[in-house]
Regions:
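Polytopic transmembrane helical bundles with strong interfacial aromatic enrichment
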Residues: 2-179
């Protein structure tokens, strides 16, 4: 694949270099847990009200994939923390710490949604009457997870984008504040 990308000249080399930087991969992946979930949530609402089990399964799979995409976004964010820290100003550093803290504290909700959506796909095979309550539960938890993703992303957007900093940075954390 590297040889194929090199055929594009500097552009291909640039892509390969970027994919070796965890902070770059984080920026590529981090929209998936939010935008992917939003699209899947809208589709699941439509599938639920149209009472199409096939459409529900398809959109539940999208919820599952989108919620699971939070894991690599989180991991690459953790790996890229030090490099981004070295590029930020003092306010950006505080927003970076806030972004990391929010992600560390709340990543579990994405995993819970992935598990619930997998159950909502599989359980109705054996218990067909469980389908509607499980889809409603997934719709509800997806809405909460979308809010959570927005909350995490809000701090992340302020790290390197001064133009988005329309409020003071969070207070600097001491070692006592951590954990």
């Amino acid at each position: 694949m590297v040889k194929e990308l090199s055929a594009f000249g500097g552009f291909g080399d640039s892509i390969v270099r970027g994919l070796r930087q965890p902070e770059y991969v984080h920026v590529l992946l981090n929209p998936l847990p939010v935008y992917g979930l939003l699209i899947a949530w809208i589709g699941l609402l439509i599938a639920f009200f149209s009472k199409s089990r096939r459409a529900q399964i398809a959109t539940l799979v999208l919820v599952l994939i989108s919620s699971l995409s939070a894991w690599p976004a989180y991991e690459f964010g953790q790996q890229g923390y030090d490099r981004v820290l070295s590029m930020t100003d003092e306010d950006g550093e505080r927003w970076l710490d806030e972004h990391r803290d929010r992600a560390e504290d709340l990543i579990w909700i994405f995993y819970a949604l992935a598990v619930l959506s997998a159950i909502a796909i599989a359980a109705p095979i054996k218990w067909p009457k469980s389908s509607a309550p499980l889809v409603i539960a997934v719709i509800s938890l997806t809405a909460v997870t979308l809010g959570t993703g927005g909350y995490i992303a809000y701090a992340g957007g302020k790290i390197r984008h001064r133009e988005f900093r329309n409020e003071p940075a969070p207070p600097k954390k001491t070692h006592e504040d951590e954990h």
